[in-house]
Amino acid sequence: MKKQLILCLFLLSLLMISTFVTNADDNDNEIYEEEEDFTTNRDVKQRGLVRENVSAKQIINNYNKYFKNVDIKNFEQGNTLVYITPWNGKGYDVATKWAKKFTHISPVWHQVKFENNKVMIEGDHNIDKKWMEKVKENSDQKSKILPRFSFEGQQWGSKESFQKYIDPKLIDSLVSTVKKNNYDGLVIEGIVHINKQLRDPFLISLSEKLHSIGKEIILVIYPFRQKGQETGFGAKDFELLSNHIDGVSLMTYDFGPSGGMNAPKVWVEDNLKFLLPNGENKNSKKIFMGIPFYGYKIGENDQSDAIVGSEFISVLKQNKSKKLKFDQNTHEHIFTYKNKKNQQVSMTYPSLLFIEDRIQLANKYKVSISIWEIGQGLDYFMDLL
Protein backbone atom coordinates (compact mmCIF):
# COMPACT_ATOMS: atom_id res chain seq x y z
CA MET A 1 0.00 0.00 0.00
CA LYS A 2 2.86 2.36 0.88
CA LYS A 3 4.60 1.65 -2.45
CA GLN A 4 1.37 2.37 -4.34
CA LEU A 5 0.99 5.70 -2.53
CA ILE A 6 4.57 6.70 -3.37
CA LEU A 7 4.00 5.75 -7.01
CA CYS A 8 0.83 7.84 -7.18
CA LEU A 9 2.61 10.87 -5.71
CA PHE A 10 5.48 10.45 -8.19
CA LEU A 11 3.09 10.33 -11.16
CA LEU A 12 1.22 13.36 -9.85
CA SER A 13 4.45 15.36 -9.61
CA LEU A 14 5.32 14.46 -13.20
CA LEU A 15 1.91 15.70 -14.32
CA MET A 16 2.44 19.02 -12.54
CA ILE A 17 5.89 19.49 -14.09
CA SER A 18 4.47 18.89 -17.57
CA THR A 19 2.40 22.07 -17.28
CA PHE A 20 5.51 24.28 -17.06
CA VAL A 21 6.22 26.76 -19.83
CA THR A 22 8.40 25.63 -22.74
CA ASN A 23 10.57 27.89 -24.86
CA ALA A 24 8.33 29.89 -27.21
CA ASP A 25 10.95 30.80 -29.81
CA ASP A 26 9.92 28.14 -32.33
CA ASN A 27 6.68 26.85 -30.88
CA ASP A 28 3.33 28.47 -31.66
CA ASN A 29 1.55 26.02 -29.36
CA GLU A 30 3.37 27.23 -26.28
CA ILE A 31 2.57 25.36 -23.09
CA TYR A 32 2.01 27.74 -20.23
CA GLU A 33 1.37 27.57 -16.52
CA GLU A 34 -2.38 27.73 -16.45
CA GLU A 35 -3.72 29.14 -13.23
CA GLU A 36 -7.19 30.27 -12.40
CA ASP A 37 -6.03 33.84 -11.85
CA PHE A 38 -4.10 33.89 -15.15
CA THR A 39 -0.80 34.81 -13.53
CA THR A 40 2.52 33.27 -14.59
CA ASN A 41 5.93 32.88 -12.99
CA ARG A 42 7.70 34.48 -15.97
CA ASP A 43 7.04 37.71 -17.83
CA VAL A 44 6.54 38.00 -21.59
CA LYS A 45 10.25 38.50 -22.26
CA GLN A 46 11.23 35.45 -20.26
CA ARG A 47 8.54 33.48 -22.08
CA GLY A 48 10.01 34.46 -25.47
CA LEU A 49 6.91 36.29 -26.67
CA VAL A 50 8.43 39.64 -27.70
CA ARG A 51 9.36 38.86 -31.31
CA GLU A 52 8.61 39.39 -34.99
CA ASN A 53 7.40 35.85 -35.71
CA VAL A 54 3.95 35.75 -34.12
CA SER A 55 0.89 33.61 -34.86
CA ALA A 56 -2.76 34.04 -33.98
CA LYS A 57 -2.62 30.86 -31.91
CA GLN A 58 0.30 32.09 -29.84
CA ILE A 59 -1.46 35.36 -29.00
CA ILE A 60 -4.69 33.53 -28.10
CA ASN A 61 -2.76 31.22 -25.78
CA ASN A 62 -1.02 34.03 -23.93
CA TYR A 63 -2.73 37.44 -24.16
CA ASN A 64 -4.55 37.19 -20.81
CA LYS A 65 -1.62 35.75 -18.84
CA TYR A 66 0.60 38.20 -17.03
CA PHE A 67 3.51 38.12 -14.59
CA LYS A 68 2.34 37.42 -11.07
CA ASN A 69 4.17 40.36 -9.47
CA VAL A 70 2.03 43.23 -10.76
CA ASP A 71 3.98 45.78 -8.69
CA ILE A 72 7.25 45.57 -10.63
CA LYS A 73 7.87 48.66 -12.78
CA ASN A 74 9.97 47.79 -15.85
CA PHE A 75 9.94 51.20 -17.56
CA GLU A 76 12.02 53.28 -15.18
CA GLN A 77 13.59 55.83 -17.53
CA GLY A 78 10.68 58.25 -17.19
CA ASN A 79 7.12 58.58 -15.97
CA THR A 80 4.15 56.59 -17.23
CA LEU A 81 0.87 58.40 -17.90
CA VAL A 82 -2.19 56.28 -18.72
CA TYR A 83 -5.58 57.48 -19.92
CA ILE A 84 -8.91 55.97 -18.89
CA THR A 85 -12.30 56.55 -20.53
CA PRO A 86 -15.63 56.31 -18.66
CA TRP A 87 -17.12 54.20 -21.46
CA ASN A 88 -14.49 51.47 -21.07
CA GLY A 89 -14.72 50.01 -17.59
CA LYS A 90 -11.72 47.73 -18.05
CA GLY A 91 -9.43 50.73 -17.80
CA TYR A 92 -10.49 51.35 -14.22
CA ASP A 93 -9.69 47.74 -13.31
CA VAL A 94 -6.29 47.84 -15.03
CA ALA A 95 -5.38 51.08 -13.26
CA THR A 96 -6.10 49.61 -9.84
CA LYS A 97 -4.46 46.20 -10.42
CA TRP A 98 -1.22 47.58 -11.90
CA ALA A 99 -1.31 50.93 -10.07
CA LYS A 100 2.36 50.85 -9.05
CA LYS A 101 3.43 50.83 -12.71
CA PHE A 102 1.72 54.17 -13.39
CA THR A 103 3.06 57.50 -12.12
CA HIS A 104 0.14 59.47 -13.61
CA ILE A 105 -3.42 58.31 -14.29
CA SER A 106 -5.78 60.51 -16.32
CA PRO A 107 -9.47 59.59 -16.38
CA VAL A 108 -11.28 61.46 -19.17
CA TRP A 109 -13.85 63.16 -16.97
CA HIS A 110 -14.23 66.90 -17.60
CA GLN A 111 -15.21 69.27 -20.40
CA VAL A 112 -14.77 73.04 -20.48
CA LYS A 113 -17.55 74.65 -22.53
CA PHE A 114 -19.01 78.06 -23.25
CA GLU A 115 -22.78 78.22 -22.89
CA ASN A 116 -25.21 81.07 -22.25
CA ASN A 117 -22.42 83.66 -22.19
CA LYS A 118 -20.43 81.89 -19.52
CA VAL A 119 -17.78 79.19 -19.23
CA MET A 120 -18.87 75.92 -17.65
CA ILE A 121 -16.81 73.01 -16.33
CA GLU A 122 -18.77 69.79 -16.76
CA GLY A 123 -18.21 66.14 -15.91
CA ASP A 124 -18.73 65.89 -12.17
CA HIS A 125 -21.04 62.91 -12.78
CA ASN A 126 -18.02 60.91 -14.00
CA ILE A 127 -16.04 61.29 -10.78
CA ASP A 128 -15.49 58.00 -8.96
CA LYS A 129 -14.16 58.68 -5.47
CA LYS A 130 -14.05 55.03 -4.39
CA TRP A 131 -11.95 54.13 -7.43
CA MET A 132 -9.59 57.03 -6.67
CA GLU A 133 -9.16 55.74 -3.12
CA LYS A 134 -8.45 52.24 -4.41
CA VAL A 135 -5.78 53.50 -6.82
CA LYS A 136 -4.10 55.43 -4.02
CA GLU A 137 -4.23 52.43 -1.72
CA ASN A 138 -2.81 50.01 -4.31
CA SER A 139 -0.01 52.39 -5.31
CA ASP A 140 0.99 53.24 -1.75
CA GLN A 141 -0.22 56.79 -2.46
CA LYS A 142 2.36 57.18 -5.27
CA SER A 143 0.16 57.20 -8.41
CA LYS A 144 -1.04 60.71 -9.23
CA ILE A 145 -4.58 61.18 -10.54
CA LEU A 146 -4.82 64.03 -13.08
CA PRO A 147 -8.22 63.98 -14.83
CA ARG A 148 -8.37 65.37 -18.35
CA PHE A 149 -10.12 68.70 -18.91
CA SER A 150 -11.05 69.02 -22.59
CA PHE A 151 -11.82 72.47 -24.00
CA GLU A 152 -14.72 71.79 -26.35
CA GLY A 153 -16.57 73.97 -28.85
CA GLN A 154 -15.78 76.38 -31.68
CA GLN A 155 -15.27 79.40 -29.41
CA TRP A 156 -11.82 78.18 -28.37
CA GLY A 157 -10.66 78.23 -31.98
CA SER A 158 -10.07 81.96 -32.45
CA LYS A 159 -7.89 84.56 -30.79
CA GLU A 160 -10.85 86.86 -30.14
CA SER A 161 -12.97 84.19 -28.48
CA PHE A 162 -10.14 82.82 -26.38
CA GLN A 163 -9.23 86.33 -25.25
CA LYS A 164 -12.85 86.99 -24.30
CA TYR A 165 -13.50 83.81 -22.33
CA ILE A 166 -10.14 83.19 -20.69
CA ASP A 167 -9.87 85.22 -17.52
CA PRO A 168 -8.71 84.77 -13.93
CA LYS A 169 -12.14 83.41 -13.01
CA LEU A 170 -11.66 80.39 -15.29
CA ILE A 171 -8.23 79.71 -13.84
CA ASP A 172 -9.69 79.94 -10.34
CA SER A 173 -12.53 77.58 -11.35
CA LEU A 174 -10.09 74.99 -12.71
CA VAL A 175 -7.92 75.19 -9.60
CA SER A 176 -11.00 75.00 -7.38
CA THR A 177 -12.26 71.87 -9.18
CA VAL A 178 -8.88 70.19 -8.75
CA LYS A 179 -8.69 71.13 -5.08
CA LYS A 180 -12.32 70.27 -4.28
CA ASN A 181 -12.04 66.75 -5.69
CA ASN A 182 -8.60 66.10 -4.23
CA TYR A 183 -7.03 65.59 -7.66
CA ASP A 184 -3.26 65.65 -8.01
CA GLY A 185 -3.58 68.08 -10.90
CA LEU A 186 -5.04 68.08 -14.40
CA VAL A 187 -4.36 67.24 -18.03
CA ILE A 188 -5.54 70.02 -20.33
CA GLU A 189 -6.52 69.43 -23.97
CA GLY A 190 -7.91 71.61 -26.74
CA ILE A 191 -5.94 74.85 -26.46
CA VAL A 192 -2.52 74.04 -27.92
CA HIS A 193 -3.50 75.55 -31.29
CA ILE A 194 -4.55 78.89 -29.77
CA ASN A 195 -2.54 82.07 -30.37
CA LYS A 196 0.63 81.68 -28.29
CA GLN A 197 0.47 85.24 -26.95
CA LEU A 198 -2.72 84.25 -25.13
CA ARG A 199 -2.12 80.55 -24.58
CA ASP A 200 1.27 80.73 -22.89
CA PRO A 201 0.41 83.35 -20.22
CA PHE A 202 -2.76 81.40 -19.45
CA LEU A 203 -0.84 78.13 -18.99
CA ILE A 204 1.91 79.77 -16.95
CA SER A 205 -0.59 81.48 -14.65
CA LEU A 206 -2.60 78.27 -14.24
CA SER A 207 0.53 76.24 -13.51
CA GLU A 208 1.71 78.74 -10.90
CA LYS A 209 -1.58 78.53 -9.03
CA LEU A 210 -1.62 74.73 -9.22
CA HIS A 211 2.00 74.45 -8.08
CA SER A 212 1.27 76.73 -5.13
CA ILE A 213 -1.03 74.02 -3.74
CA GLY A 214 1.18 71.08 -4.75
CA LYS A 215 -0.70 70.14 -7.95
CA GLU A 216 0.54 69.38 -11.48
CA ILE A 217 -0.46 70.31 -15.04
CA ILE A 218 0.16 68.40 -18.29
CA LEU A 219 -0.68 69.83 -21.73
CA VAL A 220 -1.86 67.63 -24.61
CA ILE A 221 0.00 68.43 -27.85
CA TYR A 222 -0.36 67.11 -31.40
CA PRO A 223 2.30 65.50 -33.60
CA PHE A 224 3.05 66.52 -37.17
CA ARG A 225 1.95 64.18 -39.94
CA GLN A 226 4.52 65.45 -42.44
CA LYS A 227 7.77 67.28 -41.80
CA GLY A 228 7.28 71.02 -41.95
CA GLN A 229 3.63 70.81 -40.96
CA GLU A 230 2.54 73.43 -38.42
CA THR A 231 1.39 71.81 -35.18
CA GLY A 232 1.10 74.89 -32.99
CA PHE A 233 3.77 73.53 -30.68
CA GLY A 234 7.45 73.14 -31.51
CA ALA A 235 10.86 72.99 -29.89
CA LYS A 236 10.82 76.65 -28.81
CA ASP A 237 7.37 76.24 -27.26
CA PHE A 238 8.57 73.21 -25.34
CA GLU A 239 11.72 75.01 -24.24
CA LEU A 240 9.63 77.87 -22.84
CA LEU A 241 6.69 76.03 -21.28
CA SER A 242 8.64 73.06 -19.93
CA ASN A 243 10.11 75.45 -17.37
CA HIS A 244 6.58 76.06 -16.05
CA ILE A 245 4.32 73.07 -16.69
CA ASP A 246 4.94 69.47 -15.61
CA GLY A 247 4.71 67.80 -18.98
CA VAL A 248 3.33 67.56 -22.50
CA SER A 249 1.36 64.54 -23.68
CA LEU A 250 2.43 63.93 -27.29
CA MET A 251 -0.30 62.11 -29.27
CA THR A 252 1.93 59.97 -31.49
CA TYR A 253 -0.79 57.72 -32.88
CA ASP A 254 -3.44 57.81 -35.65
CA PHE A 255 -0.74 58.50 -38.25
CA GLY A 256 -2.58 56.95 -41.20
CA PRO A 257 -5.41 54.60 -40.22
CA SER A 258 -6.72 54.26 -43.78
CA GLY A 259 -3.31 53.00 -44.87
CA GLY A 260 -2.98 50.57 -42.00
CA MET A 261 -0.43 52.64 -40.07
CA ASN A 262 -1.15 53.71 -36.52
CA ALA A 263 2.20 54.84 -35.11
CA PRO A 264 5.16 54.10 -37.43
CA LYS A 265 8.35 53.98 -35.40
CA VAL A 266 10.31 56.35 -37.64
CA TRP A 267 7.49 58.92 -37.48
CA VAL A 268 7.36 58.73 -33.69
CA GLU A 269 11.11 59.25 -33.54
CA ASP A 270 10.91 62.19 -35.96
CA ASN A 271 8.43 63.88 -33.62
CA LEU A 272 10.78 63.42 -30.68
CA LYS A 273 13.61 64.94 -32.72
CA PHE A 274 11.30 67.82 -33.63
CA LEU A 275 10.79 68.70 -29.97
CA LEU A 276 14.39 67.89 -29.01
CA PRO A 277 16.49 69.15 -31.96
CA ASN A 278 19.65 69.13 -29.85
CA GLY A 279 18.95 65.78 -28.25
CA GLU A 280 17.94 65.15 -24.67
CA ASN A 281 17.95 67.99 -22.16
CA LYS A 282 17.04 68.58 -18.54
CA ASN A 283 13.33 68.63 -19.39
CA SER A 284 13.22 65.67 -21.81
CA LYS A 285 11.41 63.63 -19.19
CA LYS A 286 8.51 66.08 -19.41
CA ILE A 287 7.63 64.74 -22.87
CA PHE A 288 5.11 61.90 -22.53
CA MET A 289 5.52 60.04 -25.85
CA GLY A 290 2.20 58.50 -26.91
CA ILE A 291 1.81 54.73 -27.34
CA PRO A 292 -1.58 53.44 -28.58
CA PHE A 293 -3.21 50.38 -27.03
CA TYR A 294 -5.76 50.19 -29.86
CA GLY A 295 -5.55 49.48 -33.58
CA TYR A 296 -7.41 49.69 -36.88
CA LYS A 297 -9.30 47.34 -39.15
CA ILE A 298 -9.11 48.22 -42.85
CA GLY A 299 -11.04 46.75 -45.75
CA GLU A 300 -14.61 46.29 -44.60
CA ASN A 301 -16.97 48.70 -46.37
CA ASP A 302 -13.91 50.53 -47.75
CA GLN A 303 -13.22 52.28 -44.47
CA SER A 304 -10.99 52.05 -41.41
CA ASP A 305 -12.48 51.33 -38.01
CA ALA A 306 -10.76 51.52 -34.64
CA ILE A 307 -10.52 48.21 -32.77
CA VAL A 308 -9.69 47.39 -29.16
CA GLY A 309 -8.12 44.31 -27.65
CA SER A 310 -11.31 42.27 -27.22
CA GLU A 311 -12.26 42.75 -30.89
CA PHE A 312 -8.74 41.86 -32.02
CA ILE A 313 -8.77 38.61 -30.04
CA SER A 314 -12.24 37.74 -31.36
CA VAL A 315 -10.98 37.95 -34.96
CA LEU A 316 -7.86 35.91 -34.14
CA LYS A 317 -9.98 33.14 -32.63
CA GLN A 318 -11.84 32.86 -35.93
CA ASN A 319 -8.54 32.64 -37.84
CA LYS A 320 -6.31 30.58 -35.55
CA SER A 321 -4.13 29.08 -38.27
CA LYS A 322 -2.88 32.40 -39.62
CA LYS A 323 0.27 34.34 -38.76
CA LEU A 324 0.92 38.04 -38.38
CA LYS A 325 3.33 39.90 -40.64
CA PHE A 326 5.84 42.36 -39.22
CA ASP A 327 6.28 45.49 -41.33
CA GLN A 328 9.97 46.45 -41.19
CA ASN A 329 9.19 50.02 -42.29
CA THR A 330 6.58 50.88 -39.67
CA HIS A 331 7.54 48.32 -37.02
CA GLU A 332 3.91 47.28 -36.71
CA HIS A 333 2.38 43.81 -36.93
CA ILE A 334 -0.36 43.33 -39.54
CA PHE A 335 -2.96 40.56 -39.62
CA THR A 336 -4.77 39.82 -42.89
CA TYR A 337 -7.82 37.58 -43.26
CA LYS A 338 -11.09 37.20 -45.15
CA ASN A 339 -14.39 38.02 -43.50
CA LYS A 340 -17.74 36.30 -43.94
CA LYS A 341 -18.37 38.33 -47.10
CA ASN A 342 -15.09 37.02 -48.52
CA GLN A 343 -13.60 40.51 -48.31
CA GLN A 344 -9.91 40.80 -47.52
CA VAL A 345 -9.44 42.69 -44.27
CA SER A 346 -6.24 43.90 -42.62
CA MET A 347 -5.79 44.73 -38.96
CA THR A 348 -2.97 46.63 -37.34
CA TYR A 349 -3.02 46.29 -33.57
CA PRO A 350 -0.17 46.70 -31.05
CA SER A 351 1.95 43.62 -30.48
CA LEU A 352 4.44 43.10 -27.68
CA LEU A 353 7.29 43.96 -30.06
CA PHE A 354 5.44 47.11 -31.19
CA ILE A 355 5.24 48.31 -27.59
CA GLU A 356 8.79 47.29 -26.71
CA ASP A 357 10.20 49.12 -29.76
CA ARG A 358 8.54 52.33 -28.67
CA ILE A 359 9.59 51.94 -25.06
CA GLN A 360 13.17 51.64 -26.32
CA LEU A 361 12.66 54.91 -28.22
CA ALA A 362 11.59 56.54 -24.96
CA ASN A 363 14.72 55.18 -23.31
CA LYS A 364 16.89 56.48 -26.16
CA TYR A 365 15.59 60.05 -25.91
CA LYS A 366 15.15 60.00 -22.11
CA VAL A 367 11.43 60.80 -22.33
CA SER A 368 8.35 59.53 -20.51
CA ILE A 369 5.44 57.60 -22.06
CA SER A 370 1.67 58.03 -22.23
CA ILE A 371 -0.84 55.36 -23.22
CA TRP A 372 -4.21 55.79 -24.90
CA GLU A 373 -5.95 54.08 -23.47
CA ILE A 374 -5.12 51.51 -20.89
CA GLY A 375 -8.42 49.61 -21.04
CA GLN A 376 -8.10 48.93 -24.78
CA GLY A 377 -4.97 46.80 -24.42
CA LEU A 378 -4.28 43.17 -23.54
CA ASP A 379 -3.28 42.05 -20.06
CA TYR A 380 0.15 40.76 -21.03
CA PHE A 381 1.09 44.24 -22.28
CA MET A 382 1.48 45.18 -18.61
CA ASP A 383 4.60 43.01 -18.29
CA LEU A 384 6.51 45.55 -20.39
CA LEU A 385 5.56 48.63 -18.36
Curated annotation (Swiss-Prot):
The record's annotation in InterPro entries points to: Chitinase_II/V-like_cat (IPR011583), Chitinase_insertion_sf (IPR029070), Glyco_hydro18_cat (IPR001223), Glycoside_hydrolase_SF (IPR017853)
Cystine residue pairs: none
Q: Which Gene3D superfamilies match?
A: 3.10.50.10, Glycosidases
**Record-linked SUPFAM superfamilies:** (Trans)glycosidases (SSF51445)
PROSITE patterns for this protein: GH18_2
Q: In the UniProt record, does the keyword Signal occur?
A: yes
**Any single GO CC term annotated in Swiss-Prot or TrEMBL for this entry:** endomembrane system
Query: What's the chief localization of this chain?
Result: secreted
Note the SMART domains from the entry.
Glyco_18
Protein name in UniProt: Chitinase domain-containing protein 1
Instruction: Please name the source species.
Output: Dictyostelium discoideum
Gene for this protein? chid1
